[in-house]
């Protein structure tokens, strides 16, 4: 990933500048995942992730992971489903949505647009269960 550390605070800047790119990307991915899990809203995660996005390659894995976490948080908040973004998302995100989504609408969209037959079938099944339980 690209190194631009001037907007990134202390330890994060050191991590991004680490010469061992594979290790740095692995640690940064873990950091992004743990922060996304801890920060409740899409807005709070976006505020935390802004300097990270400014420091990494826009087309790289870390930027994609941040964008996918942002999409997941938006989907969890009940906002409208971006069908194209959900369809284009990675298997990782689609599996996460199937496992954790509380919205039958989100799951129904994924049931139509999922990347794999397994994801589509699981999403349809969960959507049906949520509808049957009145959620």
Positions of predicted regions on the chain:
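Alpha-helical scaffold segments
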Residues: 1-135
